[in-house]
A protein has these predicted regions:
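Accessory carbohydrate-binding/adhesion or oligomerization-edge regions at the termini
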Residues: 21-91, 95, 111, 166-195
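Sec/Tat signal peptide C-region and signal peptidase I cleavage site
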Residues: 16-20
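Extracellular beta-rich ligand/substrate-recognition surface
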Residues: 94-106, 142-148
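A short, hydrophobic C-terminal helix/tail in secreted or cell-surface proteins
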Residues: 196-216
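Short beta-strands within extracellular/lumenal beta-sheet-rich domains
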Residues: 100-113, 153
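Aromatic-lined ligand-binding clefts that engage carbohydrates, nucleic acids, or primary amines
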Residues: 114, 118-131, 167
Length: 222
């Protein structure tokens, strides 16, 4: 199993030339929260062309600063500051629905355990809008009319250092219908070792044990 995991890691780390590694597609698992409901409606600017959570206005807009989510804090919990300890409103990792109750907001977290990743690109289509954070740091927000289309919103996440990273998303809708499309890729991605993989120090001890066992067998044979 250990050798198999190493082979998989190498294949993901050094893909065939010109081929990106696909990390997430629309149906892939993430943590999901659909308990926000309409608690954010008309906050952060109201039903205006520059409002973050309108009820009717379908204007195209972008948001350089993060929204105030205090009216949904009970639903979201510490999702931006402590994603390792989500409250009971969050699902376990499961396939993310590509639509939700119209006129409400939902939140998603994708977790990446990696030994390093390069040129991570995230492409989204959302009806109507979205807000994104990486490890709790706000990246961008935007809204556009019409249905979801691939590449509607594109995020250049750059390189990820070794460790666990969280891409936190809030999807906005203000009625009618909605939809969600995602495709996240990297030029290279080395998965973080699963819990069953021994630490390097343990491997050294294991190797020393095998060497000692071999010497004992040689002495007995002599």
């Amino acid at each position: 199993m250990f050798v198999r995991n190493i082979i998989i890691a190498l294949l993901l780390a050094f893909p065939a030339s010109g081929h990106a590694v696909t990390l997430v597609t629309t149906s892939d698992p993430g943590f999901y929260n659909d308990s926000i409901g309409t608690s954010l409606n008309l906050t952060n600017g109201g039903d205006t062309p520059t409002g973050y959570f309108p009820v009717f206005d379908d204007s195209t807009a972008s948001f350089a600063t993060a929204p105030d989510l205090s009216t949904a804090s009970g639903a979201l919990g510490n999702w931006l500051t402590d994603p390792l300890n989500l409250n009971a409103n969050w699902s376990a990792e499961a396939s993310i629905p590509n639509s939700w109750t119209p006129g409400t907001e939902v939140a998603i977290i994708y977790q990446f355990d990696t030994l390093g990743a390069t040129n991570v690109q995230a492409s989204f289509g959302v009806d109507n809008g979205m807000f994104a954070w990486l490890d709790g740091t706000y990246l961008f927000g935007a809204r556009a009319g019409g249905g979801p289309s691939p590449g509607e919103y594109v995020l250049n996440l750059g390189d990820l250092a070794a460790g666990t990273h969280y891409l936190q998303l809030l999807l906005e809708d203000h009625g009618g219908s909605n939809g969600y499309i995602v495709n996240i890729t990297a030029d290279t991605f080395i998965p973080g070792p699963p819990p069953s993989v021994p630490e390097p120090g343990m491997l050294a001890v294991f190797g020393a044990g095998l060497l000692g066992l071999g010497l004992m067998r040689r002495r007995r044979a002599a």
